[in-house]
Amino acid sequence: MAAELHVALVAADREVWSGEATLVVARTTSGDIGVMPGHQPLLGVLESGPVTIRTSDGGTVVAAVHGGFISFADNKLSLLAEVAELSDEIDVHRAERKLEQAKTEGDAHAERRADVRLRAAAGR
């Protein structure tokens, strides 16, 4: 059996995903980071961006994450996000409309959020 780490992706309002994984890639204020079993302990601030989780069974889970924290120690990774949603929960047409609306209104924050949702949905 390959080495694993336990992952918990939690939004402010719910647990989004929890399980065993072999690799997690997330965007932090210091740049993109990949965490594998045995990684050195870390604590960081999450940026808006897709999170990719390679599950122990060989699958891939992708989520759109907006702000929060990442913590890793003793092969336990916690992603505590202000907002997070799995790629298969994202309504692509709605996200596209929100992106166009944000561009029209010049709302950079809303534009970034819609862009992250679309990138996560594309990574399904």
UniProtKB/Swiss-Prot annotation:
A biological process term (GO) from this entry: proton motive force-driven ATP synthesis
One Pfam short name: ATP-synt_DE_N
UniProt keywords, alphabetically: ATP synthesis, Cell membrane, CF(1), Hydrogen ion transport, Ion transport, Membrane, Transport
Membrane found in the keyword field: yes
Subcellular location: Cell membrane
SUPFAM superfamilies cross-referenced by the UniProt entry: Epsilon subunit of F1F0-ATP synthase N-terminal domain
Transport listed as a keyword: yes
Basic and acidic residues biased stretches: 99-118
GO MF term set: ATP binding; proton-transporting ATP synthase activity, rotational mechanism
Location of the region described as Disordered in the Swiss-Prot/TrEMBL record: 99-124
Cellular-component GO terms for this entry: plasma membrane; proton-transporting ATP synthase complex
Bilayer topology term: Peripheral membrane protein
Principal subcellular localization: membrane
Role according to the record: Produces ATP from ADP in the presence of a proton gradient across the membrane.
Family named by the database record: Belongs to the ATPase epsilon chain family.
Self-association and partners: F-type ATPases have 2 components, CF(1) - the catalytic core - and CF(0) - the membrane proton channel. CF(1) has five subunits: alpha(3), beta(3), gamma(1), delta(1), epsilon(1). CF(0) has three main subunits: a, b and c.
NCBIfam families tied to this protein: ATP_synt_epsi, PRK13442.1
Protein's recorded name: ATP synthase epsilon chain
